[in-house]
UniProtKB/Swiss-Prot annotation:
Gene3D superfamilies: P-loop containing nucleotide triphosphate hydrolases (3.40.50.300). This is Protein RecA. The keyword Transport does not apply. It comes from Corynebacterium aurimucosum (strain ATCC 700975 / DSM 44827 / CIP 107346 / CN-1). ATP binds at G76, P77, E78, S79, S80, G81, K82, T83.
Amino acid sequence: MATKKKSSAANKGDDRQKALDAAMAMIEKDFGKGAVMRLGDDDRPPIQAISSGNTAIDIALGVGGFPRGRIVEIYGPESSGKTTVALHAIASAQKTGGIAAFIDAEHALDPEYARLLGVDTDNLLVSQPDTGEQALEIADMLVRSGAIDIIVIDSVAALTPKAEIEGEMGDSHVGLQARLMSQALRKMTGALYNSGTTAIFINQLREKIGVMFGSPETTTGGKALKFYASVRCDIRRIQTLKDGQDAIGNRTKLKVVKNKVSPPFKIAEFDIMYGEGISRESSIIDLGVEHGFIKKSGSWFTYEGDQLGQGKEKARNFLKDNPDLADEIEKKIFVKLGVGAAAAEAGEDVAMDVPGADDPLTDEAVDLVPNVDFDDD
């Protein structure tokens, strides 16, 4: 009786599998190969990223940069460094042969400043749209082309609906921008994933009226962007850097408040120097000291016995003049923290260096095994 029940269950399982295979075959015929698949059969590589151009930010993001095929939101107060971070990401993408686009809804992009940050302005695609609908339609068309690696929309607050532009001053247009963003993000999300394009939305802060508890700060454009964004970064200026009485830059803090590709709430602190952008070398020194690769004795910084300089500014200039050394220290930091491509390469090297891991058992090796007679008492 038990055998009969087992046989019946097995037959039922076979029938279900055949029905599933038939359904999957029909789905693939109608919607294309890969429309439905088992997760274990997905041969896509791990999450790829576009480096932010700064070691501290790449580590805080957890995957070595801004994830490809995802939406990223960067928000903060005025002059906190939002556009600077986005332009550095564009420069980083261009250095690896990528194509970048910048939707300048604020009509405030400074080409000379972008050039100072390392952006190839001759090959940067720029659009200065008249309306929010036009801006998002252009962005969607560029993404669907499949040729764009990174696109920046600066900013969400400046995406003004057409009805508002054509209307009179003082007219009420409640929820127009929120509906516009919600519709655009619904359309763009799938296209971004399929094309591997990173979309960075820069956003501004507003204050909610009458909030008694919690933070009154909120971002513009409704709630859709908060849901669709895989990464949200809150950026703040925390200190003014001075050389004597002259201000030469800002100490800036970036907090990853939402992260779908790595643990969230990590914080990166870095220096933004006026006329230069984010100082990569300064972050390498900070992280190098923190993780023991760079020794600090008094005001002197040393690396493997070699002096980098007295004072952080001289050490920073030394690393700037010796980019190979800066790359070496940065790679060691990434490997130790298990972040980015450097860590993945190090893992592969360790696996390949295991002695005898791939050696076949040859006849000579077999002959070296002594004969053991288990019948001897």
